[in-house]
Amino acid sequence: MEQVTLTSDGTSSVFAENTVREVCNINYWGMRYYNVDEKGDIFVCPDPDKPQNRVSLAALAEKVQREQGAHLPTLFCFPQIIQHRLRSINQAFKRAREDFGYEGNYFLVYPIKVNQHRRIVESLISSGQPLGLEAGSKAELMAVLAHAGITQTVIVCNGYKDREYVRFALMGEKLGHKVYLVIEKLSEIQLVLEEAAKLNVKPRLGVRARLASQGSGKWQSSGGEKSKFGLSASQVLSLVQMLKEHECLDCLQLLHFHLGSQLGNIRDVATGVRESARFYVELHKLGVNIQCFDVGGGLGVDYEGNRTQSDCSVNYGLNEYADTVVWGIGQACREHGLPHPTIITESGRGVTAHHAVLVSNVIGVERYKFETLAAPAKDAPSVLHSMWETWVDIQSSREKRSLRSWIHESQFDLSDVHNQYNVGLLNLEQRAWAEQLYLNICHEVGQLFNEKHRSHRTIIDELQERFADKLYVNFSLFQSLPDAWGIDQLFPVCPISNLNQPVSRRAVLLDITCDSDGTIDHYIDGDGITTTMPMPHYEEDNPPLLGFFMVGAYQEILGNMHNLFGDTSTVDVLVHEQDKAYIVDYDEGNTVADMLEYVYLDPKKLLDRYREQIEHSNLPASEAIQFLNELEVGLNGYTYLEDE
């Protein structure tokens, strides 16, 4: 029988006969980029087509600390994963076009808002794969124009636009790029036509249609009729009429729509493609020669590894996604005898999510201790005797029908203890005794629950959460995993070693910010999500390093500087042989001085003020010099906790 037990040192353990590897689902969310070796260590294989080229994350963390003098937390980035993702997406659409006889081309356009860092864009451009770039603001467009280089590149310009934005885009067209200005609101068309006339250039226009269809999940509001962007059906007709009046209907060449980010259900994709294909058909009837069909983003990744349509998972694979898009558009074209347009996808998350993993150390562990207690004194308050009677009953009875009643009775008594303590009827020692006995009761009863009994599941979760180790991790949730805080997104998190060991402990992770929101609330646990993280056995004074996986999309860009914790150190790694990792780029994380300057505090002036205070103190000269030196070193140090 599969039991839910509490170990001898007091922590709850579900799936005790399963290994951490099995319950953390790395076989699924790892996508062959991450897996566990025979020693139980997580390794990274940046190119799954070359499985012999891999390296242990633990060894990599040790290497970067030894060779670069880096401190944890450190973000490890693998450009080869990005390039493999790009190839995989291109290959999936190539195969789908061949299977369905689709006559148009396919083009992946990377929306740089997902991660604008130089290393990402350069890795994509240097991959040798066909690639376009998408910008959603003036600043992004400036970056895209520079990265586009001297070769002809497809550039898609989304977002709201002013005159300068439009002019920069048209300049890109004159420089030889295919720049599509996607009309998000009708007022933009006048700006485009005016600036195009000034520059004597024919603009390439796109239109974003606001669909009735929308995806489900955390990002569903970015699609559908209530979407922030896009034109309604009547506005699309108005746009067509305006272009006819200006005799430039042939400028409208691209149809764009967006169902929402991280689409979990493939049926939502099929529904959206079907509706947007109707726009394509109707626009052709109006004389608009649409050449490009931009289905936007939405290609999801399986953060949970359970292959469902939940918010942080997907019930489809890359090939099924490509099949759905290609077949849906191709079917509409065949039915109406229309040309097959070039299909564009803006799959940023699907390209970048897997390439980055944050590795950090645990700087403190808090565990519940279970102690042997003596019976209360005869003259002790009755509530203490009541709790003791429950304890004695558990030791002698062991009747499973009493499991819940024992928990409930002890909870009621403990509440009574707190009330009596608050009014002075119990002293501190009596309160401490009662709280410890309550822990012992929960520990003892917890061994008798069976996880297979559905009726036990809720109380099992409560006990696991109550007795979980608290791991204080050297990172800022707000800086490194902002979506975990802001929208409760789940990311795969687990130790990077000993994953071949059975689950023997549970843990919750807390960051080092002075904010109670700085905790991770949900963790992968087999086919489900729980509020505690499965852990192998570890010594309290030697906790394992932890890996936060699939943080390559949005997290670096959205991260904020709560408590003035800055960017972590970043390492770009190439793997070309087994256990051979090459560090090709290392960027030190923000220093304390960097973060102070962000809030307009001049480190030099701060140092002058330290010096002034020290000079007016009564410190001995040697100590004064030491203090000033240490403060200066501190200004130039890492914002995260450093080893001695």
From Swiss-Prot:
Its cofactor is Mg(2+); pyridoxal 5'-phosphate. Substrate binds at F293, D294, V295, G296, G297, G298, L299, G300, V301, D302, Y303. GO terms for biological process: arginine catabolic process; putrescine biosynthetic process from arginine; spermidine biosynthetic process. Pfam families: Arg_decarb_HB, Arg_decarbox_C, Orn_Arg_deC_N. Keywords: Decarboxylase, Lyase, Magnesium, Metal-binding, Polyamine biosynthesis, Pyridoxal phosphate, Spermidine biosynthesis. GO terms for molecular function: arginine decarboxylase activity; metal ion binding. Belongs to the Orn/Lys/Arg decarboxylase class-II family. SpeA subfamily. This is Biosynthetic arginine decarboxylase. It comes from Pasteurella multocida (strain Pm70).
